[in-house]
Amino acid sequence: MFAVAIDGPAGAGKSSVAKAAAKELGFVYVDTGAIYRTIALHVLRQGVDPHDAPAVEALLPHIQVELAYTPEGQKMLLNGEDVTGLIRTPEVSMATSACSAIPAVRAFLLELQRDLARKNNVLMDGRDIGTVVLPDAQLKIFLTASPEERARRRVAQLAEAGQQADYEAILRDIQQRDYQDSHRETAPLRPAEDAVLLDNSDFTFQQSVERLVGLVRERM
């Protein structure tokens, strides 16, 4: 099996770029952020503070997270319920950052992620794929873009969906998320030593996909 580990900050386009590249390569795309978001959604639904590590840990035995692959893409199932459309809100995003800093949560999901890579050729994206989850991946990418460019892209996404967005507020959220992700004690966001740095601040979406596909084909 061939594994591609893609790490990088929130809003750099990891998921959309990896998904398109996986389709072109015939690989399975694994959005690990969606897995953590599913945990965070359950925590919020239970009225638990996502920063309260013991309380979050107590919920884990009662959570069943499954990934289902359909022609439309990866679906997230939480205790049998399809929650794919419920995990992208700002509230869930901030709760995800807190939950993912809890060692017990990361340990809970680690084997699920590794099992997917053992059984499939995968493009897996997240925050610590190349450093922790798949340290032996054949290719590691650190995909990033400037906070300002990531905020602009998010505003454009929301506008396309017919939603108003405050650029300055989104930029602050991104900067706060970057700080939390890079300063947490457990698996902080950082490039693996042997990762290829891919800054797509000035790339179109298609250019990012083509660059990623090219890197994979060079290594295979």
Annotate the PLM regions.
Residues 68, 113-119, 130-132, 136, ...:
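Small-molecule kinase domains that catalyze NTP-dependent phosphoryl transfer to phosphate-bearing small molecules
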Residues 6:
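Hydrophobic anchor at the beta1->P-loop junction of P-loop NTPases
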Residues 14:
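Conserved lysine of the Walker
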Residues 9:
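P-loop (Walker A) phosphate-binding loop of NTP-binding proteins
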Residues 84-161:
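ATP-dependent NMP and nucleoside kinases share a basic, alpha-helical "lid"
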Residues 33, 80, 109, 123, ...:
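Residue-level signal for inorganic ion chemistry
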Residues 23-89:
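N-terminal phosphate/diphosphate-binding loop that engages ATP/GTP or pyrophosphate donors
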Residues 17:
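Hydrophobic positions on the alpha1 helix immediately C-terminal to the Walker A/P-loop
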